[in-house]
Amino acid sequence: MRNFEKARVQMVEQLVHRGIHDTRVLEAMGTLAREKFIDEGFIEFAYDDTPLPIKNGQTISQPYMTAFMIASAHLGGGEHVLEIGTGSGYAAAIIAQIAGQIFTVERYSTLAEAAQQRFEDLGCDNIHVRTGDGSNGWPEEAPFDAIIVAAGAPEIPSPLKEQLKPGGRLIIPVGSMAGTQRLLCITRKSTEEFDEEDLGGVMFVPLVGNKAWPDMN
């Protein structure tokens, strides 16, 4: 059996080497047991810097991408955060150690239920899970200080921009369904004004919804 504690330390060291310097993100990832979010058969690779498959044809992002996206949201502590694409729940559990409250939307009920159970087992009482169309956001809990989207959209869903607080940041991959996307950081400057920053090329599963890609199933 792999020494997960040692592997976790090495993972954080690698994140620092690759340019992640947000101490809150590093501390959270250095304490959370990532192996608890990995499907059986892939646990040995829990701390490798690679995406891994989970159920419903989805993936858990590589540790670097998780760290980079959360760090790009510039969370200082106590924020109201929306996550689109709960997946295994790992990213939400990291965010929960930094932010005040996190609301996470997952399209697949099986993934949402499994993530909810993990959160309960870990005692994460500031994570709220909903099954539904992530491209619509979570309007009842808006506005948000940050929105992090773990799936690629054809364009920026308007409801997500509308649910940002002034000064809030939206981190979202935008581009093709099957190829690469650009990771964008959208900052709300005022009611109608938004700044856009390109953070680089990425590859995510598609965001499916009425404000995103159509469901092909």
UniProtKB/Swiss-Prot annotation:
Gene Ontology biological process terms in this record: methylation; protein modification process; protein repair
A Pfam family that the UniProt record links to this protein: PCMT
Alphabetical keyword list: Cytoplasm, Methyltransferase, S-adenosyl-L-methionine, Transferase
Reactions catalysed according to its record: [protein]-L-isoaspartate + S-adenosyl-L-methionine = [protein]-L-isoaspartate alpha-methyl ester + S-adenosyl-L-homocysteine
InterPro entries per UniProt: PCMT, SAM-dependent_MTases_sf
Chain segments annotated as transmembrane: none
Leading EC class: transferase
Catalytic residues (positions): S61
Disulfide bonds: none
Subcellular location: Cytoplasm
GO CC entries: cytoplasm
EC number annotated for this UniProt entry: 2.1.1.77
A molecular function GO annotation: protein-L-isoaspartate (D-aspartate) O-methyltransferase activity
Function: Catalyzes the methyl esterification of L-isoaspartyl residues in peptides and proteins that result from spontaneous decomposition of normal L-aspartyl and L-asparaginyl residues. It plays a role in the repair and/or degradation of damaged proteins.
Family: Belongs to the methyltransferase superfamily. L-isoaspartyl/D-aspartyl protein methyltransferase family.
Official protein name in the record: Protein-L-isoaspartate O-methyltransferase
Source organism of this protein record: Brucella anthropi (strain ATCC 49188 / DSM 6882 / CCUG 24695 / JCM 21032 / LMG 3331 / NBRC 15819 / NCTC 12168 / Alc 37)
